[in-house]
Regions:
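FAD-binding beta-loop-beta segment adjacent to the flavin cofactor pocket
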Residues: 202-205, 260-280, 339-347, 352-355
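C-terminal helical "tail/cap" subdomain of flavin- and related membrane-associated enzymes
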Residues: 303-404
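N-terminal Rossmann-like FAD-binding beta1-loop-alpha1 element of flavoenzymes
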Residues: 2-42
Length: 404
């Protein structure tokens, strides 16, 4: 095949708006997929310095990916509490993993730097608009216009409205946490607490999430599934109350603070708004709506999409993105989110029942969008089946609309 000529008027072959998880993962994936030697990647990010010190990605290690070396902690047991009840589960060969943002950034940027002038990062520049043309795309930024053959848009979408219009479920997973260090050994290092619902439910679905890094140090987060964000004082008070109850007498030093907001929505995503623009990351639908997990979804997408982009660069064409998830998993997420909206008071019991009754390997796959049809049926059978069945009927219009 004859390589298309390099267009000297182009600033890059692939322009990526945003150098976060999805943008950096795709850039690395393009190199790994055999991007032509004369092709260039340009990442455009509004930050003056790229840093992931304020974020963490966690996941069940079910999918091989390029960032295994960035994993700092693995937990072979995971714990859920609801009132006086608690369950600890594990599955052979499956760990719950943590990648700190700074480790991910360091590894990704090191890999991109090794590519030399083929990869460039523009700092302190905001992408404002992307416009497809016949053989190129214009990327309008705060400092001028850039031209490329393809553009990937990882800019975060606007948070969905919390208004209930009867068409979509719009919840938010929002959290605030602290990395804490105690002078005494107070944390069980081999077990991650994914959900402790034995906390106030005054503001909606609420749990504490705990990742122990060692016996003295842990990330403790207050997490809500609700329609609106809350004042910082609510999260902080929840953490303080949990520490007083679960670790009485311990003295803690705050090492760092992190917070975040993840949309849990049934609103449809448009990952391919124009022939030469593809949305990636949250904007592309690469966050599982019912759980908020994103890391593996992004890596799966990169694995499937990067070869398509490489082929498009060689042929001079466009690259159609693969679906973010299957119609089956989309339908299940829609039903489950509708259930959480209709029955928020039942959420602690439902989540606890899932961890208690569903085989842990099956549940890990389900939460990570790696489940088989048999896995999904098992989860539905072991959950709040009558209420979920009713919610499936209520959510049928949403499911049909998303399947179009």
């Amino acid at each position: 095949m004859i390589e298309p000529p390099v267009n000297p008027a182009l600033d890059a072959d692939v322009i990526i708006a945003g150098a976060g998880l999805s943008g950096l993962s795709l850039a690395v994936g393009l190199l790994d997929a055999g991007m032509p030697d004369d092709a260039r990647i340009l990442l455009v990010d509004p930050r003056e310095t790229l840093s992931g010190a304020d974020r963490t990605w966690c996941f069940f290690d079910l999918v091989p990916h390029a960032f295994e070396a960035a994993i700092t902690h693995r937990w072979n047991h995971w714990h859920v509490r609801n009132g006086a009840d608690e369950v600890v589960r594990s599955a052979p060969g499956i760990s719950y993993c943590r990648i700190p943002g700074e480790r991910f950034y360091d590894l990704a940027l090191e890999r991109l730097a090794a590519a030399g002038p083929r990869v460039e990062i523009m700092h302190g520049v905001t992408v404002e608009n992307l416009v497809s043309h016949g053989d190129h795309v214009e990327v309008h930024t705060s400092t001028g216009m850039l031209r490329g053959r393809l553009a990937m848009d990882s800019r975060p979408p606007l948070l969905p409205s919390a208004a209930d219009d009867g068409k979509d479920v719009n919840l938010l997973q929002h959290f605030r946490g602290r990395v804490l260090r105690s002078t005494e050994p107070v944390f069980e290092t081999g077990t991650a607490t994914l959900m402790d619902f034995d906390v106030s439910q005054e503001h909606g679905i609420h749990f504490i999430y705990v990742l122990p890094f060692d016996a003295h140090t842990a990330l403790v987060e207050s997490t809500f599934f609700t329609g609106r964000l809350l004042p910082d004082a609510v999260y902080e008070s929840a953490i303080e109350n949990w520490l007083a109850r679960r670790r009485p007498g311990a003295v803690f030093e705050t090492i760092s603070v992190e917070s975040g907001v993840i949309p849990m929505t049934t609103e449809p995503f448009d990952p391919w708004p124009s022939p030469r623009v593809v949305r990636i990351g949250t904007a592309g639908g690469h966050v599982k709506p019912s759980s908020g997990y994103a890391f593996l979804a992004v890596q799966r997408f990169v694995r499937d999409f990067a070869p398509r982009v490489v082929s498009a660069l060689r042929a001079g064409g466009t690259a159609e993105p693969p679906p973010a998830r299957s119609p089956r998993t989309t339908a299940l997420d829609t039903i489950f989110l509708s259930y959480l909206r209709s029955c928020p008071d039942r959420a602690p019991d439902t989540f606890y029942r899932l961890f208690e009754r569903v085989p842990p390997a099956v549940l890990a796959r389900f939460l990570s969008d790696e489940g088989t049809l048999a896995d999904d049926l098992t989860v539905m059978r072991k959950s709040d089946s009558p209420r979920l069945a009713l919610e499936a009927v209520r959510a049928a219009p949403l499911v049909r609309r998303k399947a179009r």
